[in-house]
């Protein structure tokens, strides 16, 4: 399959954690997802780490543009949070957003196992969910939510509650 060949050509490995991957584990179970990770394409040395598919320059350009736009949104969002917490200007400069420490991940949650059957020998079985519950790492996650749902937020009084998908929102 040509899609599989394209994905395996940019698969991450022990020397580079960026690129395509379909075998992540959460609590010793394989996640039912495929991911593509990259860092700021404009960052010095990024070409040594980012793995882009050959012949898909439009994909790389689109991801660069998306990274730029979401980086600006992240900075603005963190500024709003900072202001809402009543922190002073000096404090804001100490926690300033840095694109150098940012990465982007594209997640795909397929209906079935993302690993072809002929490649599953010796792999840990799939977990019960697409990925571990409430496992986003980092300071902030910007989610371009689809119409499937699955996003939750924690309420002090009611525990985890579903956030209904809203078209066009992040």
Predicted regions and their residues:
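Peripheral, non-catalytic segments flanking oxidoreductase cores
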Residues: 1-170
